[in-house]
């Protein structure tokens, strides 16, 4: 998969930073409508120190956050939203179907389905080796800094 935005370019689009920037690169992108990102899950992730030391599993809330960050790239790189912030406003129909563990390549796909003023919705899916790890509907709010 060809990289469209690398880690440093992602940091120019969304405000997240280590240790909370949860996407490594963007491999597909359609301005304002769709984004696919990759997270290479390393055994050195800070969250694995406590979740769980004997059986490392990426917390589901961080998978949904990675999906939200992927959606934020799609929205915040559009001309009308550059320099703004995207806030998580809700999550519906969230399902976790596969554990994400060190060494996994997490593919994060978000399609923006609705925008009404500063509020938007998107369908999101995280997969590992083609198997769905998480799926959900995200709601977000765009706000000026």
Curated annotation (Swiss-Prot):
GO MF annotation list: (3R)-hydroxyacyl-[acyl-carrier-protein] dehydratase activity
UniProt name for this protein: 3-hydroxyacyl-[acyl-carrier-protein] dehydratase FabZ
Species annotation: Staphylococcus saprophyticus subsp. saprophyticus (strain ATCC 15305 / DSM 20229 / NCIMB 8711 / NCTC 7292 / S-41)
Family from the record: Belongs to the thioester dehydratase family. FabZ subfamily.
Keywords of this entry: Cytoplasm, Lipid A biosynthesis, Lipid biosynthesis, Lipid metabolism, Lyase
Reaction equations catalysed: a (3R)-hydroxyacyl-[ACP] = a (2E)-enoyl-[ACP] + H2O
This protein's record includes keyword Lipid biosynthesis: yes
InterPro entries with a match to the protein in the record: FabA_FabZ (IPR013114), FabZ (IPR010084), HotDog_dom_sf (IPR029069)
Subcellular location: Cytoplasm
Any one GO cellular component localisation term in the record: cytoplasm
Domain of life: Bacteria
Active site: 51
Function: Involved in unsaturated fatty acids biosynthesis. Catalyzes the dehydration of short chain beta-hydroxyacyl-ACPs and long chain saturated and unsaturated beta-hydroxyacyl-ACPs.
Annotated CDD domains: FabZ
Cysteine-cysteine disulfides: none
């Amino acid at each position: 998969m060809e990289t469209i935005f690398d880690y440093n370019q992602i940091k120019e689009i969304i405000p997240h930073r280590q240790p909370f920037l949860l996407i490594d690169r963007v491999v597909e992108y359609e301005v304002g409508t769709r984004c696919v990102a990759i997270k290479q899950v390393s055994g050195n992730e800070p969250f694995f120190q406590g979740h769980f030391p004997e059986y490392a599993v990426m917390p589901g809330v961080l998978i949904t956050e990675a999906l939200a960050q992927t959606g934020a790239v799609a929205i915040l790189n559009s001309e009308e939203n550059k320099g703004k912030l995207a806030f998580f406003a809700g999550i519906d129909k969230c399902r976790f179907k596969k554990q994400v563990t060190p060494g996994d390549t997490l593919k994060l796909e978000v399609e923006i389905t609705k925008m009404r003023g500063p509020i938007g919705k998107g369908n999101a899916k995280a997969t590992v080796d083609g198997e769905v790890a998480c799926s959900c509907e995200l709601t977000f709010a765009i706000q000026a800094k």
